[in-house]
Amino acid sequence: DTEMVFITCGMGGGTGTGAAPVIAGMAKEKGILTVGVVTIPFAFEGKVKIKKALQGVEEMRKNVDSLLVSNNERLCELYSNEIMRLEDGLAKADEVVTVAAKSISEIITMRGIINRDFCDVQTVMKDGGDAIMSVGYASGENRIGKAFVEALKSPLLNNVEIEKARRMLYIIYSSDEHQVAISELNEIRFFMNDLAEDIEVLWGVYRDNTLGEQVKVALIATDFADMNVTMNDKASQTTEQQKVMMDMYYGERKQK
């Protein structure tokens, strides 16, 4: 029996925007842990397409347990100082979605030193609402702390303040040759100090021998305190609600 399903689509068009929420709702009604992973348009694609995309996002939010939104506009910001071809930029957008789904799947399918399983993922993502899934890599001194910082640069964060998450799961990966030392775990303290006092945190340690001297941090955060933006009905959003969503996804980036 299927325990978990990922539903991915690009919002703003016809097929994905209309069909994905329906499919998601059918899966969730069957008790399947349902995770939506969607992309929303670049700002230059225009307000009509963006408005349609955000309405689709809201419909997805109503029909999934957790929703990851990858914003193409954030990719422009992150790579604004690089000479990147459009084709490569679009590939990056696809990569963000792929990495998110793959990282969640690996937590379930791989065996960790400090292990986490489907029940742990379910604890964090069941009825979790808006979600963050990000991955960061680092090596050298303070590598774990730096990996957390890199994870927080993810396009999946949008204008979300991770400090307001009430559920979190993170996994630290390292190779056999360059295992994480107990002393290195102190670096996590500085990250945790900024989180909500009532946050529920699960964590694990896994092996990945492709990393060499690097560590990888995979982070899932859900259940945000102030992100309950909902529509009054299935057809339309109020002007105020539209403004909140526009600011969340297309407003000025909040600096950490």
Sequence positions of predicted segments:
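Tubulin/FtsZ superfamily GTPase core signature
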Residues: 1-256
